[in-house]
Amino acid sequence: MTRFNAIIAALLLAGGASLQAHGQAGASRRSASDTVPVGMQLKLGDVVVYGSHRDFGLRSSQMSAVSVTPAMIERTPVFFGEPDVLKSLQRTPGVQPATEGTAGIYVRGGDYDQNYITLDGSPIYNVEHMKGFVSAFNPDMVQGISLYRGGFPARYGSRLSSVVDVGIEPGDFASYHGKLSLGVLSSRLQVAGPIWKSHTSFNLGARVSYFDLIAKPILDKVYDNSDGLKGYENMGYWDVTAKLVHRFNPSHRLSAMVYYGYDRDHDEPSNSDRVTDLRDNPYVHDYEKIRFEDHRAYSTKSSWHNLLASLYWTAWFSPRVRLNTNLSYSAYKYDLKFDYTVASHNEDKEKMLYDYNENVVQQFKTLISEVALTSDVLWSPLSNHMLRAGVSLSRQRLKPEAGVSRVYDKVKLVEVDESGGLRYASDADTLYFHVSEKQYLNTWSAYVEDDFTPFGALRLNAGFRAIVYSVRGHTSFSPEPRLSARLMMGSNLALKASYARMSQGIHRLVSGNLVMASDRWVAMTSDIPMMKSDQCALGLDASLPWHLSLSVEGYYKWLKNLIDYRDGVSYNMTQVDWRDLVAVGKGHSYGLELMLERKAGNLTGWLSYTWSKSLRQFNGHGNVVNGGREFYAPTDHRHNFNITVTQHFSLSHHWNLDLTAAWSYLTGRRGTIANTMVTPPALYEYYAGEADGTTSGQYISFPQWVNRTFFVLHMGDTPEQFYTTHNRNTYVLPAIHHLDLTASFSHSWKYGESALALSIYNVYDRLNVSNVYVGFKDTHAVLKGMCPFPFMPSLSFTHKF
């Protein structure tokens, strides 16, 4: 085997690369992943090889997918100049951020939990640091990213909307090297090299943040009201990623990977003290000459942990047959604690009148863990066939917990007798409530797929996946056909189409309240079935002059068995079974996507645009939300436009300059805000008798002409005034847009390569509203917007050694 053929074999079998070799006289031959005989001969002069983590280009049967390289991640301007894996995906078609500046992704109208995100083939449940500002992946450890938003191959399943496959770079088997990065928000260190040359390698990366040391003092000077930063000043994270690879022989390889990430978010206690002393005031009545003391304190503490460990064995039984087996463990834990204290004391000059002390603590915990075993075989019996087949087993454990403790004591003067004797009444109590539930979801699946070429112009990927979900007392089966097709309409134009059915056994409950959002993970039950989706897509891929590629796609997606909170449900109703708080419904989304990209040359970049709609409806018997009327999903954004352009300059043999400009526009996100006040007895007259005795958390249905279901916040002998909404997700925040610039100077020298990058986020200082809260203006309650990302310059330094 020649050296060139050995390189081809290694790349093709290692991870699905695509190679195009150009030789003399302009002749070329393209080879797709796992389809090329190792013994092929190419007579070449000077060779230039272009490779990527996955090839989803013109000649691939795959559509609705994109591959992102580490270089693209580094060139994407982001807040505080922090390279981010998921934020680079947000600039591709069909992908939207949760809010401005955050790393979470929503794909083709789907929800956050509908993304199957893997690290080296193993699932990870929480992919964010710092309340979503930073993704959980260390960019220095990433080999490549593949995002599927439709046309899913049969080897993927268990989520409805997307698959994000993040590959970790293996260590170098021959030499040591590393990378040190210093930024405004965090620092990173990555080291790789051989443990046993040519046999065992390692790759180790670590990150730590220091928001309060550099970023916060800068923001204090920028913000018009620095009090808005109090929720971030005790926020931080760190993570470690490690990969070990051992080659037993040329045919067998074992990889071990470990990831651990930790976040903390401890708000500074908010205190309020008020003292009023009227005992010596000559202008008040004698019974008003009292000294009042009132103290209130409130604090929030939260932390979350991610742990992922996997063993991955690869065996080549022949150049055409490969077996992959992966054993993994993934766990996510979230802790949230509210602490509220009240102390009141009243006295006059002679005696104590009233003393009250109360402490309330609320705690919420979520634990998700999964053990999974997957195995699949790849077989290329012919040059125009690539067969895959595999099985997977997994067991998920979901354990949500909620607890409330309340301790109070009260002493009150009730009587003063004629002789001046005092009689006090006292009351004290301790209340503790805790609810916990364990759910276990077992999943079995098997698949088969074939990527083949019936004839020259037509290429197909046909597959079938069978999946079984099982919880206590209930089992569901989902047959899932998959088909993707590519038809060449000339040498530079291809028509593509796809269909995929997907299913999902876990749900994420989300409050759509823009003022106070919340979430909770739960498994399907006998009453709440697994979610399903069917998606069709049609598109054109074109190869254009000047190294340009163009992709245009339209899609339609049907969603079934979605769940959502019923109207008016509060996220902290800990004493109510979550099954009684939710409704089951359906949804659909559709849109048009465009992407223009240039990867070669000194001028590179991409342009993407998405027009889309996403709607939900809950109108089944006993599952009515929003009066049964269709409403927009929280993930509905009509327009999403991104353009990123990078110009490379070779200033000298050792100096290089890269200038990057990126502009983004996104329609504002939707949410629900209580904007309708109901005052008794107007709407209650009809149900006055039935309303009597209603307790907090119950629902009251009003006459048909009202066509609403209202939620009662407080009830005494008669209903009190309260707020509600007319429709779900009718409030739309203003559109978000910003221009970001980055200039990176790099210098090569005998000790490695150093780079200094200056980034400016939001150049024209657009006030982009990410959230709203209730404030006051002239004693009137009004909605105020939070704009956390103003004009923000940052500096970072990187050294490769």
Sequence positions of predicted segments:
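Surface-exposed extracellular loop regions of Gram-negative outer-membrane beta-barrel proteins
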Residues: 491-536, 556-579, 620, 662-674, ...
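Transmembrane beta-barrel wall of Gram-negative outer-membrane proteins
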Residues: 183-208, 223-270, 301-323, 387
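Gram-negative outer-membrane beta-barrel transporters
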Residues: 556-558, 580-673, 798
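Face-selective signature of the C-terminal outer-membrane beta-barrel domain
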Residues: 245-263, 299-472, 488
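C-terminal beta-signal and adjacent terminal beta-strands/loops
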Residues: 664-719, 734-740, 745-801
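Short strand-turn segments of transmembrane beta-barrel domains in outer membranes
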Residues: 132-135, 143-153, 162-193, 201-208, ...
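Outer membrane beta-barrel strand-and-loop segments of large Gram-negative receptors
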Residues: 366, 370-372, 435, 525, ...
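Periplasmic N-terminal accessory/gating domains of Gram-negative outer-membrane beta-barrel systems
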Residues: 29-36, 46-50, 60-113, 121-140, ...
